[in-house]
Every structure is written in C-alpha cells, then in structure tokens.
Amino acid sequence: MTSGGGYGDPSQKIDYVFKVVLIGDSAVGKSQILARYARDEFSLDSKATIGVEFQTRTLVIDHKSVKAQIWDTAGQERYRAVTSAYYRGAVGAMLVYDITRRQTFDHIPRWLEELRAHADKNIVIILIGNKSDLVDQRAIPTEDAKEFAEKEGLFFLETSAFNATNVESAFSTVLTEIFNIVNKKSLAASEDQENGNPGSLAGKKIDIVPGPGQVIPNKSNMCCNS
C-alpha cells in the first residue's frame, strides 16, 4: 500500500529508485501532471517543455522508501532524437493524451510502438486521458480509451492536472505495480538462495534504474476504471 504523501526528506534512506517516463503529444499536459504530482502545483501559463527534464518524489510503499524519478520530454517530432537515452532504464511509463483533442488519442498507438521499441519489454504502462475537468469539450469517450487499454494490456485512468483528479492514483498505480513485481523477484531470489541456487538478490539493495526485468500481470487485472 502506498503511503507517506509528502515530498521527500533529503536525509531519508532510499530502498528503491524507479524511473518513470511521460510520453505523448505536445500540450496534452504531461508537464502539468508532473508538476501536480512532484510539487502539487499547476500553472495556466505553462510553456511547452524544451528538451528533457526530470523531477523526483519520495514515497513509502509497504514500509519501504521509494524514490520516483519522473522524466518529461516535449512531444514534438524534432525531439525524437532523445528517445533512446530517455527510455533507457525506465520501469514505468505514462502514455498521455488530451480527452478534448482526438488526434492526441489517435497518435497513442504510435507512441506505444516507440515505447516498446526502445524500453524494456516488461515496462509497466498506464494510459492517461488528461483534462478530465473539460467535460463539455470531450472528444474521446472513456470507453474507447478503456477498450484500447484492455486490448494492449495497459492500466487506464482519466486525470485532471488542473484540479488534481486521479493524478496521485495514476502514479500510485504504476509505482505500486513496479514495487510488487520487484518484491516478487526478490522473494524468488531469496528462495533460490535457501535452496542452494546461485544468483540470489537477497540482502542487496535493488536499484531499478539500470534495467528492469518485470512480468506484466494478466490483462484482466490491469485496467483501472476512472
């Protein structure tokens, strides 16, 4: 269970570091989602992200300290050159579209294809329909996105960075899933050691940033209703 909604203590011991990337078209609200989660801020004057930036937030999951390292890059085509470095070591991804702009949802399969080409094959992915506060401007029915997420084996939520709806839940869903996968791997390694098998990770701090090896759960368990 995720707890400790604070924004981190510099002196706190870190048990895990999870790299999560935000991807999607420009102006869907990726930077706003990150600002809301990392600093609980929202600015109507937010400018397009140029290049790459990342922010961190430390939280507690099952009594373990987890640092989320969240990367954000602009969605314009001219920044595609950063992709391989951007995706390297990521164990979670947030695939964001704007519920008021149909083309941003239509581009999601392309973003997903790029993600799967560059990232670890077992990366934990959540599809996010942002700007859910703009109900009267909705262009993508929730059911369409939910159906796509189920077909592709993704988590799904609709969020609003403006009023903070489901922003915490979206990050919590991804980070908790990664944590559970890592814990299962650690437990399996510990059992191997007890059985005299080599290659155990027991007793070691597991830093996930260099490269994951998760197993995605069954699709039937992966879609989170908004």
Swiss-Prot record:
Transmembrane residue ranges: none
Q: Which InterPro entries match?
A: P-loop_NTPase (IPR027417), Rab_GTPases_membrane_traffic (IPR050209), Small_GTP-bd (IPR005225), Small_GTPase (IPR001806)
The cross-references to Pfam families, in alphabetical order and at most eight, read: Ras
Region feature Disordered, mapped onto this chain? 189-226
Q: Name one GO biological process term.
A: protein transport
**Bias (Polar residues) ranges:** 217-226
What start and end residues bound the annotated signal peptide? none
Q: Identify its membrane topology class.
A: Lipid-anchor
Give the similarity note.
Answer: Belongs to the small GTPase superfamily. Rab family.
Name this polypeptide is given: Ras-related protein RABA4a
- Source organism per entry reads Arabidopsis thaliana (Mouse-ear cress)
Q: Which gene underlies this protein?
A: RABA4A
